[in-house]
Amino acid sequence: MKKNLLIVAVVTGLVMMGNSTKAQMKIGYVSLQELIPTMPEYRKADTALNDYQTALQQNFEDMRREYAEKDSLLSSKDTVKFTRAQIEIKRREVGELLIKLQGWNQQAQQLYQQKQQDLIAPIQKKAVDAIQAVAKENGYTYVLNKETLLVSPPAEDMLPLVKKKLGIK
């Protein structure tokens, strides 16, 4: 009898503890894809990235123009003015420029991605820090990224609270 009473007491305690844990859990979600573009820092970074991309494109155009000029010089009748050694040097220069041009797209893409990472990483960190602060202030147990959810339990959208924390209207 005492054994049965003890089992009932333990089971009742576990059930009560499980219910109180569920009652204390507060879930929220936020969309980083919606939050980050609304931040003033993002607009500045986006402008800087556009300027950087324009500079990279201009650099490519300058290299392409230089290649076209040197290549056309070798193709023209003016090559009779040059010695064989000079022609060979110019051909080598044209070949090097062609190789540089062919690799430029990949190099420019890597440069752009690095610049993007350098500019966006601090903005993402600021957003995540604000989300963590709002979660702590409002007693959220879990905060989920809205974009990664297919199915989720009922939760509160924290985006307005985070925007308020960041001073975004």
Predicted segment positions?
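Bacterial N-terminal signal peptides
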Residues: 8-16
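Short, flexible, glycine/charge-rich loop motifs used to bind or transfer phosphoryl groups or to couple energy/partner
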Residues: 16-17, 133
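Sec/Tat signal peptide C-region and signal peptidase I cleavage site
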Residues: 17-23
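Amphipathic, charged alpha-helical segments and their helix-to-coil junctions
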Residues: 24-169
